[in-house]
Each structure stands twice: as structure tokens, then as C-alpha cells.
Amino acid sequence: MKTSAVLFFVTLFLVVSVVAGCAPAGQSQATAAPVVTTKTYADLTLCYPQLGAESDWRTANTASIKETAEKLGIKQLVFSDAQQKQENQIAAVRACIAQKVDVIALPPVVEDGWDAALTEAKNAGIPVIIVDRSVSADPSLYAAHIGSNMVLEGERAAAEFNKMLPNGGAVLELSGTTGSGAAVGRAKGFRNKLNPNIKILDSQTGNFTRAEAVPVMQAFLKKYKPGQDFQGVFIHNDDMGIGAIEALKAAGVNPGDLKIVSVDGTRGGFQAMVDGWFQADVECNPLLGPQVFDMALKLVNGGAVDRETLTNETVYYPDKATDLLPTRQY
């Protein structure tokens, strides 16, 4: 009986020991599991190699990025100005890769020539967001694009000329930086939708700047008579539009003599509508800061993002320009 009792208690001890040895295993595993930490804006380092400061639009875009970074309290914004030179942008991207930033948000000055730099960023494990303009590189080399539908902007401009010149005519085109996504897209959209009875008489680049648009418009006016040889001008951004107005004024052209459609929707563009120079201004919103930082934080935390995020935009007209001008943020 004693032997049986001893065997019973020994057996019971062993069973309890085995159970006790197994039961905490799950608890130990849970305790030892790596803790997943979610990064916040305070942990985020973002590189923004801005393409330049060529226009009011670009100035507003820079302000949106900087102001949003400050408001969100991000760890570091690595900002640079490439002065509209791709080689400067590429150098800035490579410097950010060497610095091991979390995300690169790139507003490319032109579409082509980005494969090498984007490949380097991808190999370094740094996601790249293409901002504003587009690139021709393999989409697998960057995480997403945030910006405007430049082709649609050109199509909207064409629709305005189709309405204003129902019997046909001829227009001039002041285009943006050669090879840039904005210039390529707007030119393509414009040609997609322009009625066949409206001829594009001539097209020259003003490089998206007010200063360069003046001599281009002056050269146009030496070759073609306003109202006779051409009835309208499609201008790829408001800064060039303001430069064109300067040349038109000097040549004795008055507001309303020509049909002018611009792109951007800046304060300068609204003033040109108020003054009777622009008949329409196709919106292109530069205030992309909140969207850029929201997407950047999702990317560093492994979240899914949309490959293409297009801003919601419209077309503005002179009849509302006076009322809306004081409310414009850029």
C-alpha cells in the first residue's frame, strides 16, 4: 500500500512537472516575440530634392512641403533646390541615399534619365514617391505617384478653345520645360481634344518662367499678327502667361483681343482673368504636402498605398475670379 502510494505521488509529481513545463511555453514565446513598433512623424526623415523655384506654383509647392513638415513635427526634412537641372537633382537623390533617409519624394524636372538613381534608391531599401510631374522609368522602381493629370489639363484647355472658336482658327502654344512631364502631358492632351478646325500655328517653350516667356511671345508677334494670323494662345502655366501679357501689352494688344487659356490657378492667373486677359485658367494644385507625408508614413510602416494619387482639380473662369482671388492660397 505504501509502495502504491509512493508510486502514485511520484507519478503525479511527474505529470504536474510536465504540464508545468509545457504550459508557460506559449507565454515565454509571446514574451520573446519581437515588438512591432509603428513609426510616427517624429521618427520620419524625408528627402525632397525640389526641382527649382521657377514659378509661383513651385514656390507654393515648396511652402506646402516645408509647412507640413513643421506642422507634423517630422524628424528631418532634407530639402534642396536643383535650379531646374536634372544633374543637380540626381546628385541630391544620391546624397539622400547615402544619408539613409526613410523616404525620397521626388518632383522630377524631366521625365527621362531616372532609371539609375531610382534603382540605387530601391537597392538601398528607400521608397521613392514621384511628386507632381511624371517619370518614364520602370514603375517598379518607385512606390507611387502623387500629382495632377497633366494630359487632362491639356484636354480641358482644348475644350475651352473648342467653345470659344467654334468656327475654327489658329492658336499659339507657349509650352513648359522641354521633356518635363507637365509639358509633355499638357501638349498631348491639348492635341488629343482640340477640334480639327483649330490649327496650332506655332509652339515654343518658355521653360515655365515669366522671364523666358517674354522674348518667346515677342518673337511670335514679329512672325504672326494677333487676331489675323492667330486668335488664341494656350499657355502651360500662369507665370509664362504673365510674361506673355507683358509682351502683348507692349505690342498694343488689349485684353480680350485674343482668347488665352492658361494652367495653374495661381493668384497671378486669377488677376489676369480679372483684368480680362485670361478667358480660363485650368487648375493645377501645388499644395501636395499633406498627401506626401501621409503616404511617406504609410510606406515606412509597411502599409499599402495607391500607385497613382491624382489631385481633384477644376477650371476657373473670369466671372468668379474677383470673388475667389482673395481666397487663393498661392
Label for each model-derived stretch:
Residues 106-122, 190, 202, 207-271:
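Hydrophobic alpha-helical
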Residues 29-44, 174, 178-182, 192-197, ...:
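Hinge/cleft segment of the Venus flytrap/periplasmic-binding protein
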Residues 35-64, 68, 72, 77-95, ...:
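Extracytoplasmic "Venus flytrap"
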Residues 39-41, 89, 145-171, 184, ...:
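Hydrophobic alpha-helical segments within soluble ligand-binding/sensing domains
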Residues 112-152, 170, 266-274, 325-326:
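Flexible loop/hinge segments that line or gate small-molecule binding clefts
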Residues 79-81, 137-160, 173-177, 203, ...:
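Short beta-strand elements at the ligand-binding edges of bilobed clamshell
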Residues 1-44, 70-71, 119-126, 323, ...:
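Short, low-complexity disordered leader/linker segments with a strong preference
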Residues 57-72, 153-157, 181-199, 212-216, ...:
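Short, solvent-exposed amphipathic alpha-helices that sit
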